């Protein structure tokens, strides 16, 4: 029986130069594996707690030495000797050890690092790829990437309200071809921005961060880039948005669109989305309304839920109990999956299973503060999520996930790429 022999954590850096945790697990056969925990910029109120030191003399208060110490002492002490391949049991022990609903004591960053490293170590010890260990024989589907090629909102220092303008390469036979087409659109977009004397600096997730006069102009130029790159707009490559509306809303559920110089209530904002969807091939909108605006979400879901994918990120924060409430109220039809929002791999699996049981689409997702760790690439294939958000085709911490997916596709001798089937049910 494989057991946990040792656990330790180290403070390392993420892609934004902020500290994060690298957790390592050593098993009884001396197999060792590590995992680096990501961190978000725009976070939902109900996310599990990311423990920071708040010591202003180090990293402007963002150090994670306390979380590392929790791994190196409390967590290590209670997990050594447990069966390594009993992921659910170990994760439940972590939850009980913390004793709070949101990991306020140990820190979700401490807990997730150990949970990820354990899964990776167990897979390695059994000589299995991580996707096969977590997903079994049915792990065959390569996810459709949602590539964030223009950044706004909290991910960039510019005048665009919407946080992410994405492309989705749907009309392709393989992940490799879909990724190639996306890269070509990205490079074509850069040329178009250069021609307009627009900034081609990149945001946290590798997308460009130009200054536009309103929130529609990015849709126009991305549409041009798709066609100029030689692809059919809508048919081969579609558009998607992450509005991150919780960043735009006030206490009265009015949404402040600086790009349009407008203040809209929920119904007016939904009407605005309907105009955009009618004019552009937008197939997905994430966080179209605030995480607290459940009445607005119900209206959005009624108006657009049969037509496009409506993704809850801040709305559901990868939390099964919150998702269950959304299911009961017919809110949204898809959920973003971010393991660090909930705390452990097992809890993430629970949320994915609930979503799939109720025909909610799952979108595996990175965070804006990432690293070279490619865990979510394997995780997306393991659970056949069908979609993944992991940035543009720039910045090595984003490319690490794409390169891992290319490796997996090769190992699976192509696997299944469901781009053409993804939205046919709509």
Swiss-Prot record:
Biological processes, Gene Ontology terms: glycolytic process
CDD domains, alphabetized: enolase
Main enzyme class: lyase
Binding sites annotated in the UniProt record for (2R)-2-phosphoglycerate: 163, 338, 367-368, 389
Known catalytic reactions: (2R)-2-phosphoglycerate = phosphoenolpyruvate + H2O
Organism name: Helicobacter pylori (strain G27)
GO CC aspect terms: cell surface; extracellular region; phosphopyruvate hydratase complex
GO molecular function: magnesium ion binding; phosphopyruvate hydratase activity
Pathway linked to the protein: Carbohydrate degradation; glycolysis; pyruvate from D-glyceraldehyde 3-phosphate: step 4/5
Cofactor remark from the record: Binds a second Mg(2+) ion via substrate during catalysis.
Domain of life: Bacteria
Gene name of the record: eno
SMART domains to which the protein is assigned, alphabetical: Enolase_C (SM01192), Enolase_N (SM01193)
Residues that bind Mg(2+): 242, 286, 313
Cofactor(s), names only, from the UniProt record: Mg(2+)
Gene3D superfamilies: Enolase-like C-terminal domain, Enolase-like, N-terminal domain
EC number: 4.2.1.11
Keywords associated with the record: Cytoplasm, Glycolysis, Lyase, Magnesium, Metal-binding, Secreted
Function description: Catalyzes the reversible conversion of 2-phosphoglycerate (2-PG) into phosphoenolpyruvate (PEP). It is essential for the degradation of carbohydrates via glycolysis.
UniProt name for this protein: Enolase
Family statement drawn from the similarity comment of this UniProt entry: Belongs to the enolase family.
Intracellular or extracellular location(s): Cytoplasm; Secreted; Cell surface
Classification via InterPro entries: Enolase, Enolase-like_C_sf, Enolase-like_N, Enolase_C, Enolase_CS, Enolase_N
């Amino acid at each position: 029986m494989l057991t946990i022999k040792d656990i330790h954590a180290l403070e390392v850096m993420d892609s934004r130069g902020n500290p994060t945790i690298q957790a390592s697990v050593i098993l009884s056969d001396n197999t060792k594996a590590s995992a680096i925990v990501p961190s978000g910029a725009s976070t939902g109120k109900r996310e599990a707690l990311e423990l920071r030191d708040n010591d202003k003399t180090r990293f402007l208060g963002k150090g994670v030495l306390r979380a590392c110490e929790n791994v190196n002492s409390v967590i290590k002490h209670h997990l050594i000797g447990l069966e390594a391949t009993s992921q659910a049991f170990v994760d439940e022990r972590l939850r009980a050890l913390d004793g709070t609903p949101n990991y306020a004591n140990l820190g979700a960053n401490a807990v997730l690092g150990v949970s990820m490293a354990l899964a990776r170590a167990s897979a390695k010890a059994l000589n299995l790829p991580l996707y096969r260990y977590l997903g079994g024989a049915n792990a065959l589907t390569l996810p459709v990437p949602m590539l964030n090629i223009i950044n706004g909102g909290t991910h960039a220092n510019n005048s665009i309200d919407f946080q992410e303008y994405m492309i989705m390469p749907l009309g392709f036979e393989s992940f490799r071809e879909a990724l190639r087409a996306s890269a070509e659109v990205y490079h074509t977009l850069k040329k178009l921005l250069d021609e307009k004397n627009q900034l081609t600096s990149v945001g946290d997730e590798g997308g460009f961060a130009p200054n536009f006069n309103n929130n529609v102009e990015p849709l126009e130029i991305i549409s041009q880039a798709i066609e100029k790159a030689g692809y059919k707009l809508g048919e081969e490559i579609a558009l998607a948005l992450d509005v991150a509306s919780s960043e735009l809303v006030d206490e009265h559920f009015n949404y402040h669109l600086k790009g349009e110089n407008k203040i809209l209530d929920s119904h007016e904002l939904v009407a605005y989305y309907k105009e955009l969807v009618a004019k552009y091939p937008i197939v997905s909108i994430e966080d179209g309304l605030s995480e607290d605006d459940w009445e607005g979400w119900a209206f959005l879901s009624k108006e657009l839920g049969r037509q496009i994918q409506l993704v809850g990120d801040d709305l559901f924060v990868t939390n099964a109990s919150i998702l269950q409430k959304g299911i009961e109220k017919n809110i949204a039809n898809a959920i973003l999956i971010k393991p660090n929002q909930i705390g452990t791999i097992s809890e993430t699996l629970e949320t994915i299973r609930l979503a799939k049981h109720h025909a909610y689409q799952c979108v595996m997702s990175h965070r804006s503060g990432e690293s070279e760790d490619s865990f979510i690439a394997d995780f997306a294939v393991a659970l056949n999520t069908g979609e993944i958000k992991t940035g543009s085709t720039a910045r090595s911490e984003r490319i690490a996930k794409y390169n891992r997916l290319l490796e997996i596709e090769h190992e699976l001798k192509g696997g299944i790429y469901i781009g053409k089937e993804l939205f046919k049910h709509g």
